[in-house]
Each structure stands twice: as structure tokens, then as C-alpha cells.
Amino acid sequence: MHPQQDFYDILQAVTVDCKDNGECFTVIDRVAAVERILEKTDYKLISRQPLALLYAKRPLREGDRVMLISSHIDCVYDNCFCADGGDCLRGTFDNSFTNAALLCNMVHDCLSDNVVVAFTGNEESDSQGAVQTVVALGQMGCEVASALVLDVTNEGWESGALFTLENDLGIDILTGYNIISSLEEYDGRFAFKHNALPDESWDYADYGIPSLTLCVPVGGELHGDAGVMLRKESALEYCNVLSLLASLLC
């Protein structure tokens, strides 16, 4: 389990603005927050692209087989906020929530050494951050075994799902079986949607990378400045499921 207060502190820190113009970041508050949070961890910035920050625990070498976790940091909100709403959190969480969940796993060293983390921009328009990530890893001579994309969704909110699995693209049958088997304790508490709305998994799959999206269900308009509601129970379980899926996709 991940320390609850650590997660909430990180979520508060990264629920700040981040914009791009399709070529580079133009508002970098969240970029700065990510860099600050990771300063005292084992993770090093291995590639800075105009629309992506790539982190790993060790330098990559040609021929390395890596597992990619991708969480976009761009947002469309005019005003970002994070508030406590009792059993729920309320805020502009597309996509600061998954940024925080990923950072929490990194800070507490819950991911394998062969994981590469990409904080990407431009997802809300053309996903150029994802494209730059693939190109950068290709230039390093790495093989990307799989990609786990992190995002938020309205799917599963009404049914009380803790998380959803979406857009499984190119995941082999054995890996899929292992994933479902490992989630037995969540039986009835997560939703699965094979063909969901487009996200970065589609872009990684276009490059032949087996991809899967882990989403957290929220209530409300995803891109509205009034924010969304997110169950606290979902928040902490999402962090745990993230590290579990990462270990199975490595």
C-alpha cells in the first residue's frame, strides 16, 4: 500500500497548469512540479523532448528491452484545483490524478528497473508527446515490450468501479489471462472496455507496441473547469493496481 498522505500531497502539487502549442510546452508549472518531486529519487531524466520527459532508474543501452508507462501532463483547464469532498476528491484531474499515482509509485520505488516513464504533452490534441517518446526510445536502440497508458474516464463511475481497463491493443492472450487472474480480488469492482475513446494507447499501438490503458473513473465533465468527483477508495487502489500491471507487462 502507498502512504495516503504522500499521495494527496503529490496530487496537490501536480494539479497545476500545463499547456503546449503542439511543438513545445508553453506553460510548465506541472513540468516543474514533476521535476521537483523526482529530484531526490533514483529516477533520472534520460531524455527531454519538446513535448515529453522520459525517466528511468538507470541509463539505457542499445538493445535494452523496456516497459513504458505513459501519463500525459497537458491539460485544457483555465483554472486547476484539488479539493477534499469527503468520500471523494474534487478537482481538475485530467490528467493530474494519474500523474500523481505514477509519481507516488516512483517515489516509493514500486516499479521494476526496466520501466521507462514518459510524462507527455499534446495528448489533448495530436499526441505528439507520445510520438516523440517512441522516436526517442528508438534512437536509443531500445525495444519497447509494452506500454501502459494512464488516464481518467467517465466509464465505470455510475457502477462504482474502482478502475477500468481500456483499449487493450496487441496484448497477447497469456498476458491478458495473467492480468485478469491477478485482479480476482477486485471482482465486480472494475470495468473492462475493449474499444474505448482514443488515447495514447492508440498511438503506441500504431508503432507496433502492445498497449493497455488503466483509467480511474470520475463523475462530471472531464474537461470542465468545475472539476470532477473521484472516489478516495479508487485513488489508493489505482496506485496499487498500477504497480501490479506494470510488473505483469514487463
Regions found by a protein language model. Give the residues of each.
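Hydrophobic/aromatic beta-strand patches that form the interior of the parallel beta-sheet core
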Residues: M67-I69, A118, S146-L148, P210-L214
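Active-site metal-coordination/substrate-binding segment of hydrolases
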Residues: K40, S47, G63-F119
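Active-site-adjacent substrate-binding region
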Residues: W157-C250
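Acidic/histidine-rich catalytic neighborhood of metal-dependent amide-processing enzymes
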Residues: L89-L174, I180-S181, G188-D203
